[in-house]
């Protein structure tokens, strides 16, 4: 679970243009991640506010309860290095080979290869390797933003493609923050006693949006570089502020992670 109270999303595929150089230099090392060892190094030195069983975690990278899940993600990089045919693909945006978890499927063969890669990673790790929701999210948002632009004459799709391209070139892990806390399941988000049971927009400006709320069951968020925050239920007109999809860095100011509940 993680809470966002409040968070200013400075860069979002649905709000702002994005610069690859700015992404790399502002948050992570300037070199793309190429293997599991690189990935582990990319997690060092982050300022994450994490609580595990009521205690603040000072070093999540080497915490004995967290490290096994990190090792599983590292294997997604090492498999791509050992078997690029299985775990990487050619990006239609850049023409370069990218990790298959960052690839937007172009054919039924791509989907078959996704399944084969996931099956192999399950055999190698024996656990969840935490990148499936992020992969599914960029694939669904690819078509959703395209349809939105066609209907509303917006520019979401090109902004989204620019962000995905930046993620591919840096070879980042994308966490999919989808599951809501929900609260009273008989009520819509806007009718909840606590509005923060669902992530929602609290302020908008030309610079971006401010969001607040909670998501649940996001173990892989700690092991990601960026989060795609998405709603998970059907929303009505009164839930407009809850209909937000955006990308935020894992170590963005204002995020609190509650791990292990």
Model-identified regions with their sequence ranges:
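Basic/polar N-terminal segments that are highly enriched at the extreme N-terminus
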Residues: 1-41
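General beta-strand structural signal in soluble alpha/beta enzymes
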Residues: 52, 175-178, 210-212
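FAD-binding core of flavoproteins
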Residues: 181-261
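Internal helix-loop-helix
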Residues: 78-174
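Glycine-rich loop at the start of a catalytic domain that most often binds anionic cofactors/ligands
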Residues: 62-67, 96-102, 190-192
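A short, Trp-centered hydrophobic/proline-enriched beta-strand micro-motif
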Residues: 171-184
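Acidic, aromatic-enriched beta-alpha/helix-loop junctions
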Residues: 71-86, 241-244
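N-terminal-proximal low-complexity accessory segments that begin disordered
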Residues: 25-75
């Amino acid at each position: 679970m993680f809470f966002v109270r409040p968070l200013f999303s400075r860069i979002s595929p649905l709000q702002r243009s994005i610069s690859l150089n700015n992404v790399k230099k502002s948050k992570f090392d300037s070199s793309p991640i190429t293997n599991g060892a690189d990935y582990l190094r990319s997690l060092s030195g982050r300022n994450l506010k994490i609580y595990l069983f009521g205690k603040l975690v000072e070093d999540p990278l080497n915490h004995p309860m967290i490290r096994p899940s990190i090792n599983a993600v590292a294997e997604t990089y090492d498999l791509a290095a050992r078997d690029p045919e299985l775990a990487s693909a050619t990006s239609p945006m850049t023409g370069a080979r990218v990790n298959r978890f960052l690839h937007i499927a172009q054919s039924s063969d791509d989907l078959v290869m996704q399944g084969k890669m996931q099956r192999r990673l399950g055999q190698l790790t024996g656990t969840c390797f935490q990148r499936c929701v992020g992969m599914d999210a960029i694939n669904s948002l690819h078509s959703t933003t395209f349809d939105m632009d066609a209907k509303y004459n917006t520019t979401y799709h090109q902004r989204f493609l620019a962000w995905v391209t930046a993620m591919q070139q840096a070879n980042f892990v994308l966490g999919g923050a989808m599951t809501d806390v929900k609260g009273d399941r008989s009520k819509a988000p806007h009718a909840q006693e606590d509005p923060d049971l669902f992530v929602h927009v609290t302020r908008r400006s030309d610079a971006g949006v401010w969001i607040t709320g909670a998501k649940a069951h996001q173990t892989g968020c700690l092991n990601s570089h960026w989060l795609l925050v998405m709603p998970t239920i059907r929303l009505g007109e009164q839930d407009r502020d809850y209909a937000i999809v955006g990308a935020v860095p894992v170590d963005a100011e204002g995020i609190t992670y509650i791990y292990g509940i």
